[in-house]
Swiss-Prot record:
Protein name: STAG3-like protein 3
KW Metal-binding (keyword) present: no
Subcellular location, record wording: Nucleus
Keyword Nucleus: yes
Top-level division of the source organism's lineage: Eukaryota
Domain SCD intervals: 10-95
Pfam families: SCD (PF21581)
Family: Belongs to the SCC3 family.
Protein's organism: Homo sapiens
A GO cellular component annotation in the UniProt record: nucleus
Alphabetical keyword list: Nucleus
């Protein structure tokens, strides 16, 4: 029963009108994905993280990128992120130009983890877009 409730919770809270609730939800989904990867590191939950990469509020985007850093920082989990990475890589690369400094910094840190832990995912052109920033 609890697992059933937890399955429905992200769907409701990731679309909440309050950015604070969306940020908390994404942060917790990231924790669940790391702790209970067999149940939560799936496309049905990763889509919420992908959607919030585009959120209009800075704090939500920061929490989203930090959640992704936790996942991409664990080599055991990166193989399960291949489809997600293929879908959202271009957006993650473009986030280094985010108007909010904190989001851009976290995006660069995320790309460094992707470069280290997922060989061949970031192309030269992706890396070249980071060089002027750093």
């Amino acid at each position: 029963m609890i697992f059933s409730m937890l399955r429905k919770l992200p769907k409701v809270t990731c679309r909440d009108v309050l950015p604070e609730i969306r940020a908390i939800c994404i942060e917790e989904i990231g924790c669940w994905m790391q702790s209970y990867s067999t149940s939560f590191l799936t496309d049905s939950y990763l889509k919420y993280i992908g959607w919030t990469l585009h959120d209009k509020h800075r704090e939500v985007r920061v929490k989203c990128v930090k959640a992704l850093k936790g996942l991409y920082g664990n080599r055991d989990l990166t193989a399960r992120l291949e489809l997600f990475t293929g879908c959202f890589k271009d957006w993650m690369v473009s986030m280094i130009m985010d108007r909010e400094y904190s989001v851009a910094v976290e995006a660069v840190r995320l790309l460094i983890l992707i470069l280290k832990n997922m060989e061949g995912v970031l192309m030269d052109v992706d890396c070249e877009s980071v060089y002027p920033i750093v």
